[in-house]
Amino acid sequence: MKAEFKRKGGGKVKLVVGMTGATGAIFGVRLLQWLKAAGVETHLVVSPWANVTIKHETGYTLQEVEQLATYTYSHKDQAAAISSGSFDTDGMIVAPCSMKSLASIRTGMADNLLTRAADVMLKERKKLVLLTRETPLNQIHLENMLALTKMGTIILPPMPAFYNRPRSLEEMVDHIVFRTLDQFGIRLPEAKRWNGIEKQKGGA
């Protein structure tokens, strides 16, 4: 897939990508891989625990993940470009998003670059998508999600889908990534779309 996605007025689509320490690091990795293939400019910030999770759950190093992004930033760099509302971006995705980061974003703590960038999305009314990872959920988690939803945030838990009859773990992960990119109008031809149960059976 080599097609580049452009803004309506021209120019590359620009997205901020955050990765936290929640389980599911592969969602962030595959997201970056697909965004790179789509020609999207990405600005990546990785939390310290995300670095640990990447090493534990995937076969990638932090350096390899950072190389998938167009630009990378330290989580400590509160003076980075993405910390300002004047930075030109089309939105932000946090994949995966821990409950700690969810709470920080909801309360506007902005205690690191990742949560500050998310806070910027909220104040600038730009699209913010959180792939929240936790189960079961307690009342605090649910109230944080509800509050952010009321602020315009898209809560997109990376739940596996089986109606498209995935044949591998990678297909299940990619389905979530494609649904995430749909939120920004990035509709990849590789994404399987539901066309009704009979057609789905026939195409299996």
Swiss-Prot record:
InterPro entries, A to Z: Flavin_trans-like, Flavoprotein, UbiX-like, UbiX_pad_YclB
Induction: Up-regulated by salicylate via the transcriptional regulator BsdA.
Annotated keywords: Aromatic hydrocarbons catabolism, Detoxification, Flavoprotein, FMN, Prenyltransferase, Transferase
Record note on disruption phenotype: A triple bsdB-bsdC-bsdD deletion mutant no longer converts vanillin to guaiacol, the conversion stops at vanillic acid.
Reactions performed catalytically: dimethylallyl phosphate + FMNH2 = prenylated FMNH2 + phosphate
One Gene Ontology molecular-function label: flavin prenyltransferase activity
GO BP term, example: response to toxic substance
Top-level lineage group: Bacteria
Binding positions (FMN): 21-23, 47, 98-101, 133
Classification via Gene3D superfamilies: Flavin prenyltransferase-like
Pfam families for the chain: Flavoprotein
SUPFAM superfamilies: Homo-oligomeric flavin-containing Cys decarboxylases, HFCD (SSF52507)
EC numbers on record: 2.5.1.129
Keyword DNA damage: no
Function in brief: Involved in the non-oxidative decarboxylation and detoxification of phenolic derivatives under both aerobic and anaerobic conditions. Flavin prenyltransferase that catalyzes the synthesis of the prenylated FMN cofactor (prenyl-FMN) for phenolic acid decarboxylase.
Family: Belongs to the UbiX/PAD1 family. YclB subfamily.
Additional comment: It is not known, if phenolic acid decarboxylase forms a complex composed of BsdB, BsdC and BsdD. The term subunit is often used in reference to the operon, however there is no experimental evidence to prove the existence of the complex.
Subunit structure: Homododecamer.
The protein, known as: Probable UbiX-like flavin prenyltransferase
Organism, scientific name: Bacillus subtilis (strain 168)
